[in-house]
């Protein structure tokens, strides 16, 4: 059962000093109560509220300091502070939080103020004196929530003003092994010109292993089997050695030079008595590009070639190249 607040015998008039003795039952410590009384708005002449000083073992004087009157009716609010640390250590902690109840003497002394509310918050007794006590400010009847308690001390108030909430740096995570958060650098955004250059200057993929020179022979008309000798010992390492990739034109020229070297080697082996035999593939160069279709050139190729006479034929009567008019003749 929570503590019951019992007041002294009610009096018809308000006490001059404004003291309200409060006691707790069941060995529960009750904190000090500071009550402010406000007149009812129905009275014609508002009376200045009386403030009761804190009741404790150290304060025994009953001097009351009247507060200036206000036009708006105030709600009676109790200022409660925890007991000293030495007293709290000697007494056991309560099992259940105390239930706030207004003193009956206060209700008997102010029966007319039906519209005013009584707010008597009880602070927990397990709190140390280092924490700032709740200082409640009397609010109007229209307010339904209490203001946030201010910071304790002027230094803390100045620190709160100088450093706002949004400027406060985030506290690192506490633990035995705090893991630092990796900072991800923003990815640089490429401009249009840089992106275009990257697309144009993109590296070509690595070419496959170059094929041997024998694979280039089908592009050129191949001679008979008798004309193609076996490769010599000097040419074998040249065929197997890897080379840089070449264009189609250079590969065709390599094939022509290879055939010429093969023909020369064959002529040397046959000797001068064997006679020279030039392969038909060496009479013309291979096509270095694909020819276009041309009808005029095809027509000229189909005509018979003109005959060239090496001996001039001389007639006995020379031919006259003079012209005569029509209807006239020479005598």
UniProtKB/Swiss-Prot annotation:
Disulfide bonds, which pairs?
Answer: none
Q: Where is this region: Disordered?
A: 1-112, 128-185, 204-247
Question: What segments bear the compositional bias annotation Pro residues?
Answer: 94-105, 170-185
InterPro entries membership: DUF4643 (IPR028004)
Q: Which domain of life is it from?
A: Eukaryota
Give residue spans, biased composition: Low complexity: 149-169, 217-238
Cite a single Pfam family from the UniProt record. DUF4643
Protein name per the record: Proline-rich protein 33
Species annotation: Homo sapiens (Human)
Organism lineage string: Eukaryota, Metazoa, Chordata, Craniata, Vertebrata
């Amino acid at each position: 059962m929570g503590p019951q607040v019992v007041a002294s015998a009610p009096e018809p008039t308000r006490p001059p000093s404004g003291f309200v003795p409060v006691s707790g039952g069941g060995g529960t410590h009750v904190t000090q109560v500071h009550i402010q009384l406000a007149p009812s708005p129905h009275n014609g002449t508002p009376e200045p509220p009386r403030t009761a000083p804190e009741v404790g073992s150290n304060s025994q004087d009953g001097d009351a300091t009247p507060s200036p009157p206000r036009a708006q009716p105030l709600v009676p609010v109790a200022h409660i502070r925890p007991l000293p640390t030495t007293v709290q250590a000697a007494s056991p902690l309560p099992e259940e939080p105390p239930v706030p109840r207004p003193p009956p003497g206060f209700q008997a002394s102010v029966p007319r103020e039906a519209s005013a509310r009584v707010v008597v918050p009880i602070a927990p007794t397990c709190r140390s004196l280092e924490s700032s006590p709740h200082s409640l400010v009397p609010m109007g009847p229209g307010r339904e929530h209490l203001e946030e308690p201010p910071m304790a001390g002027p230094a803390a108030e100045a620190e709160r003003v100088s450093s706002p909430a949004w400027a406060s740096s985030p506290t690192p995570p506490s633990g035995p092994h705090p893991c630092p958060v990796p900072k991800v650098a923003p990815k640089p955004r490429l401009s249009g010109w840089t992106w275009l250059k990257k697309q144009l200057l993109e590296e070509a993929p690595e070419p496959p292993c170059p094929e041997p020179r024998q694979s280039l022979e089908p592009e050129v008309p191949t001679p008979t089997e008798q004309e193609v000798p076996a490769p010599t010992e000097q040419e074998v390492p040249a065929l197997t050695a890897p080379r840089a990739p070449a264009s189609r034109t250079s590969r065709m020229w390599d094939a022509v030079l290879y055939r010429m070297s093969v023909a020369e080697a064959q002529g040397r082996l046959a000797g001068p008595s064997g006679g020279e035999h030039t392969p038909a593939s060496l009479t013309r160069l291979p096509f270095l590009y694909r020819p276009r279709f041309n009808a005029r050139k095809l027509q000229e190729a189909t005509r018979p070639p003109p005959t060239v006479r090496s001996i001039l034929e001389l007639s006995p009567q020379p031919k006259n190249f003079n012209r005569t008019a029509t209807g006239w003749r020479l005598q």
